[in-house]
Design a protein with these regions (language model features):
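Flexible low-complexity loop/turn motifs enriched in small/helix-breaking residues
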Residues: 20-140, 144-152, 174-178
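Short beta-strand edge/turn micro-motifs at domain boundaries
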Residues: 154-177
Length: 178
């Protein structure tokens, strides 16, 4: 009977702990800026669907997130608008790129040639997803680039924080290109 009482006491003590695992980590503002600017830079420099050779004098970045941008089949979080502070800090972090960064509210806000589907003024449009943390040092971020109707691509990037710096270590899931 004593063992049974001990067992019951253990179960009663453990019940409140069920489901009390920590929630998924939330990015700090600095992590948010670092992750987004790392992926934008990767798209600008090499993942532009032209092997990094495309001149991109204007980089339009959609300020509202869209998780379907990399892998449309994955579950989606609600869209959020990146804060002015985050946008400005991302722009500052990318100031060494030879492009003009323009933040837009939506894809439809960018002028596109109706006959060719090409973004006006040789620009490109980047759409970003929400940062999905797997733990404090590993995150996923969906993103895509649009140049024209048959020149676009998207994927989900895997990032890891190494020695305090967020780096892309690979991709996961569907990668698409048109």
């Amino acid at each position: 009977m004593r063992k049974f009482n001990l067992f019951i006491a253990f179960v009663c003590a453990a019940i409140p702990l069920v489901g009390c695992r920590s929630t998924s980590p939330k990015p700090t503002e600095q992590d948010t800026i670092a992750i987004y600017q790392t992926v934008i830079k990767q798209i600008y420099q090499s993942d532009d669907t032209f092997g990094g050779t495309l001149e991109k004098p204007i980089l339009y970045i959609v300020r509202a997130t869209n998780d379907a941008t990399g892998d449309p089949s994955l579950p989606r979080s609600s869209s959020v608008v990146l804060s002015e502070t985050v946008q400005q800090n991302i722009t500052n972090a990318l100031s060494n790129l030879p492009t003009t960064i323009i933040w837009v509210d939506s894809f439809d806000q960018v002028s596109i040639d109706p006959n060719t589907g090409v973004v006006d003024d040789k620009g490109v449009i980047i759409t970003l997803g929400n940062i999905q943390y797997e733990n404090n040092d590993r995150a996923l971020l969906s993103a895509n680039i649009y140049v024209a109707n048959l020149a676009a691509g998207g994927k989900t990037y895997v990032l890891e924080k190494k020695d305090g710096v967020w780096v892309i270590t690979g991709t996961t899931g569907v990668e698409w290109i048109s």
